[in-house]
Amino acid sequence: MSLWQHIRRSALLLPLLLAACAGQGIQGASSERDIARVEAYFHTVDLKAAPFSQVWPDGAVGSGELAYHPGYLDMRFTAPHPMTLHAEGRHAVFTDSATGAETRIGLAHNPLGLLLDNPVHLGGAVTVTDIRHAPGVLQLSLARTDNPSQGLVTLRFRDSAARLALYEVRIVDERRRVTVITLGSG
């Protein structure tokens, strides 16, 4: 078998492997507690004018302020130039002020849509595929239960004194392109 055939076969099997892994989910009392804590965070979070930075898949960097509560996201970029992303429910609109372009995005098959349910529920249609702990950090990865190959969202929280604070969202789309959003001013 040639190298090209091996790569092609591997690429064809990848969605099946992702589906198998995501379908297993995370089990155990500790994992259930972590999931419940993250759900509780999303039930009460109400970010307003939170500074953020974003690294796009091509390495370009942007920054601005965002507002978020379950079912709603508004990102106002100030760098590299004024842009907005407004997402509510199942749709998002990206507006680039420099070009005047407006792009409408359906979120039913987009990883970002995992965070726009109201309330956010980490079960049923959403599968927690991985939970990791480091000192002062809780990390959860999420995928759509019915089609995990559509993308993955990894959430990183500061975990101090039993309180969670979201500080990073890493989104991997169906083409394995990575976008990283970091909350905070530095």
Give the role of each language-model region.
Residues 65-114:
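An acidic-aromatic
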Residues 52, 73-77, 92-95, 140-142, ...:
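Short hydrophobic/aromatic-rich beta-strand segments that constitute the beta-sheet cores
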Residues 123-124, 130-186:
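Gly/Pro-enriched, hydrophobic low-complexity segments
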Residues 44-46, 67-73, 87-91, 157-166:
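Short, solvent-exposed coil/turn segments at beta-strand boundaries
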Residues 21-63, 69-71:
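N-terminal leader/targeting segments and the immediate start of mature chains
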Residues 2-12:
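Bacterial N-terminal signal peptides that target proteins for export
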Residues 36-52, 56-57, 95-152:
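Flexible, processing/modification-adjacent segments and terminal tails
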Residues 10-20:
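Bacterial N-terminal signal peptides
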